[in-house]
Every structure is written in C-alpha cells, then in structure tokens.
A protein has these predicted regions:
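Short coil-to-beta-strand
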Residues: 1-7, 55, 93
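Residues at alpha-helix boundaries and short interhelical turns
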Residues: 16-19, 40-44
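Divalent metal-dependent catalytic cores for phosphoryl transfer on phosphate-bearing substrates
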Residues: 42-100
Length: 100
C-alpha cells in the first residue's frame, strides 16, 4: 500500500490551503469510486489500487496556475493530468500515473 498522504505532503508542504483543497476533493472522489466498485463485486476491482489512484489523480495541480484554488505554479491548469503522471512515474508508480 502506498502512503498517499506522505506523498502528497512531499509536494504540497509549502501549500497548506491547496493541500486541503486537493485532499478534500480527492477523498470525495475516492469514496465515490470505492462505493461504486463495492456495489459491483462481479468486476473484481482492486479496491486498494482504486482508492490510491483516486486519491492521487489530481496530484499535478501543484504545478499549475489556478489562483482561484490556490495553485500558483507556472503551467496551464489543463496540464495537471500529464504533470501528475510524470510525478508519479518519477516516484516509481507507473500504474497510478495512468489514472492522472
């Protein structure tokens, strides 16, 4: 199991407001994903991976410029997906990177 909070803290330590926004959103997404997957046991979903991936799917927003949600990076917000994927691959998480 990946320590998702530790990984998020590594990249968001200087942005507590953004970290809280990201965590609240990602936790809601993860809760919905897991709830839906549990309603469909016939799919044999890897619930641990699903929850981790949902919690990390927007990790790249820290690199973007979206002041309305406390993002003060330089990239366009639309880039957060591929930037998050690059970050997760760098962290040795290529499977999780595919979800960004």
């Amino acid at each position: 199991m990946v320590d998702v909070k530790l990984l998020i803290d590594k990249y968001y330590k200087g942005s507590p407001e953004l970290r809280e926004i990201l965590w609240t959103h990602s936790k809601n997404v993860a809760d919905h994903c897991v709830r839906i997957a549990r309603q469909h046991p016939e799919l044999n979903v890897d619930l641990e991976f699903l929850e981790e991936a949902a919690l990390l799917h927007d990790i790249g927003v820290v690199f973007t410029d979206a002041p309305g949600i406390c993002c003060f990076g330089s990239a366009a917000y639309i880039c957060h997906g591929y930037l998050g994927a690059e970050l997760l691959r760098k962290e040795g998480m290529p499977k999780h990177a595919r979800v960004c």
